[in-house]
Amino acid sequence: MFPKLIAASLAALLLAPAAYAENFDVKMLNKGVEGAMVFEPAFVKAAVGDTVTFISTDKGHNVEDIKGMLPDGVEKFKSKMGEDYVLTIAAEGLYGVKCTPHYTMGMVALIQAGAPVNKDAVAAVSLKGKAKARFEPLVAQIVK
């Protein structure tokens, strides 16, 4: 009886973080509150273990990491065009994302998971034009 109780308690403890994981929906839009070609919301404050679901509300969009804007050890990602994509937050830090065909039009987003441990690396990435203009206010929302 006692070993079964210990095993059940350990299983409950190991599964507990998954039970508290949260999902955030981010729409990929042709037109939104911030103008044309946007993610809404463009800034997400998540935790390790949470998921972010990018919803292809308007077709012709995808989601891809911005080179140099992922925490150490996190694998690069790129979704198929016009399909929803679920990103599981695997590590603490900042995740810069873009819509590949609309990147130059400023279709960017930022996810913060826990402490911004890779903030310096994200700041070192050179964005241009509308992508830079839209990304700067997102960086200003980072919580230390």
Q: Whereabouts are the PLM-identified features?
A:
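Extracytoplasmic copper-binding redox domains, predominantly the cupredoxin/blue-copper superfamily
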Residues: Y20-K144
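N-terminal signal peptide c-region/cleavage motif recognized by signal peptidases
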Residues: A16-A18
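Bacterial N-terminal signal peptides that target proteins for export
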Residues: M1-A7
